[in-house]
Design a protein with these regions (language model features):
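Vicinal oxygen chelate
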Residues: 5-12, 60-84, 87-125
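Core segments of cupin and vicinal oxygen chelate
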Residues: 8-51
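Short amphipathic alpha-helices in soluble, non-transmembrane regions
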Residues: 20-23, 81-86
């Protein structure tokens, strides 16, 4: 059974935020495959069905308390991505560090318009 097909993230100004996601998502294993005036689309292939991540312009969108978390293969990958998000303009970075319980290592941050994101790794028990 498929658990997640796609994420459609809303942003108030696509042109302002596009460079952030065009650097972040490829570092997470996504490939950009579509760009139109108000929408970017990325996909990630793996052992399961293809996953899609869209960034859509919605001028009246305001960030809220929702958070999207991405999986990292290792603690080192979380650390590498934490450096990248700082370099590309992430806001309110917390971590990387252990949080949420034993073996849960993550960095929490916001994109340049305030959408909440996370990159995490769960150590094997």
């Amino acid at each position: 059974m498929r658990r997640l097909d796609h994420i459609d993230l809303r942003v108030p100004d696509l042109n302002a935020i596009a460079p952030f996601y065009q650097r972040l998502l490829p570092a997470l294993g996504f490939t950009q495959d579509l760009t139109v005036p108000d929408w970017l689309q990325f996909y990630a292939e793996g052992d399961g069905p293809t996953e899609f991540f869209g960034v859509t312009e919605s001028r009246h969108h305001r960030p809220n308390e929702n958070r999207i978390a991405f999986w990292a293969e290792s603690k080192d990958e979380v650390d590498q991505l934490a450096r990248l998000v700082q370099e590309i303009g992430a806001l309110n970075i917390e971590g990387p560090g252990y949080d949420e319980g034993p073996g849960y290592y993550a960095v929490f941050f916001e994109d340049p318009v305030g959408n909440r994101l996370e990159v995490c790794h769960r150590a094997a028990n």
